[in-house]
């Protein structure tokens, strides 16, 4: 029991008019407007839970500055309430008491509660949190619920505070006068006050579980419930929602609608899930770097909703999401139950710490992207209570926020831990990218860590070195573009979003591993992504294009050489044609020379058809232009080193008949096809049964009704 000696003595020392004046003064937060409903207090279980939270996060002082002693034993509660609303109320009450810890301790000393009364040390935390709520209610009596079971420790502390109500109000008034402040809210540091102001307007962010419902279905469902789609929810008191500009599956709601939203089926069935936007930015950055069958390794995820979001985004792929750092295997059944409710199927839990996992672990050989969410100061978060509840952060997170800053020593410790994790992530040779994300506003935890890791990265690994890559998220404003000029993605704390820092490290491309289009298509065909489409060989036109590209790389001297070769070729062909025409126009040679010509004709084809003296000259004019064009196609240069010297031989030939003899004589006269091709007769003088030479038959089909047997080329002489 509390010893409250002197309570009655003090109760008669003050005038009732002074009491009413003190209680009517604005107290914490300056929220004394008529529109704000009067607070009636919290249930007993909330006070006990808040006292235990405060006991773990309170600011410890040196022995010379200790005003109140705190015990180390937590208070026992009748039942651990798992209701999220009770947890939120307890954390908010503990965090508020932590921000005003110095002021509340001063009021307790000034009001003579300490050390005039004998109070057990383990109740000091409960007195602090209940005193904050007492002054926030303007020292009004708490309204008790009939269904609530009272807790003895709470009842004792409440009776003590009510008995010292007047003196507590006077001590609070003197404290405000000392600091020249309208309320104790204005005694807080400016950074903390700005943080509270941002938290009051910060909207709610929720991502759509596309595994269960499409965005269009969510829009229609909300519209049926009276929600209107707008571009911005800022300063709007109606039931509205907006779509985030950076993440297509994230919706934004005004903060005052949370109690209404958590009771609808979309949130109860895990079709919409509340989460801070910074986590969605990190997850979408990873998704933009993944291929169809790439795995992901997530480090220090905090909230399992972040893992679930990553799993939902890769649901259509063959990717796996590995999560490391889950040391307690007892949580596995609960996690699997949660993942089943959300619809996640590709999550694998690793119980080792990230630092203890080897880079050559056989389970992580397909991991291409590592998402690193290191523990940071988190001072970019405006509403730390919501962040702790949603992201499962340590309660130590609240201590730094209550003071609006962090000590230099603690900042260095955090930066060193972040550097070690980042450098360890860069040792995974199979990984191609690392996404580094924090909620800190200090460069020591952001740019400095990334630049140091890039500068001192181990270049002895088999993989290519890492480099800083630009953001893969869309930049939606000029301010975002200016903040991302150095390839870092930043979002400063504001009334619409928490602060966020995002960096993407990717490996430099190996110049020896150039992948062609055909390789990509072949890889896709092997995976069955082309629906059975067969890849054909490259066409002749593509080959000619490749040859033309290689020829274009030659210099001007090569072009001049080609022109000289063309000129030499034309001169040689002109001389060859002139010599051939001279030999054909000569008179008939003796039989010996004729045999020599026949032998040479068997060796090679004539380059050009020479007119026979017996054939009239008008035959040249009657020939169509197309055969002449084809004749030029057969003109090929013959190098001199390949010329074969012909020796005269004796060949006994049958009697030679003139071209105007009978067809039988013509047919028996020609020993070879080449000699046969030399005789050309005018159409008017040659009978219809005269066989056409093979060259003209190939070039142009006869128009007369000559029998097919006569059009056959004659056989060689046996």
From Swiss-Prot:
It holds the Pfam family NSUN5_fdxn-like. The active site is at 439 (nucleophile). Residues 591-604 have a biased composition (Polar residues). The keyword Lyase does not apply. Belongs to the class I-like SAM-binding methyltransferase superfamily. RsmB/NOP family. Residues 696-706 have a biased composition (Basic and acidic residues). Coiled coil: none annotated. InterPro entries: MeTrfase_RsmB-F_NOP2_cat, MeTrfase_RsmB-F_NOP2_dom, NSUN5_7_fdxn-like, NSUN7, SAM-dependent_MTases_sf. Residues 536-557, 578-616, 694-718 are annotated as: Disordered. GO terms for biological process: RNA methylation; RNA processing. Keywords: Methyltransferase, RNA-binding, S-adenosyl-L-methionine, Transferase. Disulfide bonds: none annotated. Residues 538-549 have a biased composition (Basic residues). The gene is NSUN7. The lineage of its organism: Eukaryota, Metazoa, Chordata, Craniata, Vertebrata. This is Putative methyltransferase NSUN7. It comes from Homo sapiens.
